[in-house]
Amino acid sequence: MAGVVSVDGLRKRYRSRDPWAVDGVTFALEPGQAFGLLGPNGAGKSTVVKIIAGLLRPDEGKVELFGSDPGDPAARKDLGFAPEDPDFPKFLRAAEVLDYFASLLGLDEQERKRRIPETLEFAGLDKERRQVRQFSKGMKQRLGIAQAILGRPKLLILDEPTADLDPLGRRDVRALIERLKESGVAVLLNSHLLSEVERVCDTVAIMARGRVIKEGKVVDIVPEGRTLEDVFVELIQATTPPREQLPSFISDQRPS
């Protein structure tokens, strides 16, 4: 089966005199794999995602989406995206929200009647009759994912899917991601909640200053008795110039 995403030697900067926003990034994403793209603010994660989605062109290197250029509409139709804070009309119900997006996808009435209940059931919203304005944050996140998979994508990009969720909401979203993986959907996850990434991602790439400084399977890069957060913090501190690190009297007071 063909790979989902292939990124090879990717470089991008926004102006000729600027430093590289992305500098030599290489990784691949396969069907049914959950891949975590991690890094502090300004590391270049969003730029990489925009290039994969065909919203930006790289300056150097090669990016393929399902074996094609990311700008190819045929490739992009197999891509779904769920933002951190999905926004839907507050007085619609979940089924009505999906019906609206199904019409934008060009699905005929018969296909909509089949696909919408199927998608709502997958997202655990099939029995929900309340309007969106009455939804919890977690329910809105699940509706956002439902909208993103309505077109049956082979790649789903999730931006901070568990941010600001309570433990039950995070559990529901994790379960949904696991079901997507089991169905063969590849998931590209951008999140600062490293404990969540560690639980759902097979592979991660940690970025700093536009470069991937560590990439591999979670089980391989996180030593026994340590956490992904431990590894992340050590790597980022090792690549951050001393002048940009917190003064010792501040860092010493940070919670352990």
Residue ranges and their predicted role:
Residues 142, 152, 235-242, 253:
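Short, leucine/isoleucine-rich alpha-helical interaction segments at C-terminal helix-coil junctions
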Residues 119-122, 224, 235:
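Short acidic/histidine-centered micro-motifs embedded in hydrophobic/aromatic stretches
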Residues 19, 181, 225-229, 241:
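Short glycine/proline-enriched turn or capping motifs at secondary-structure junctions
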Residues 211-233:
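Conserved beta-strand-loop-alpha-helix hinge in the C-terminal portion
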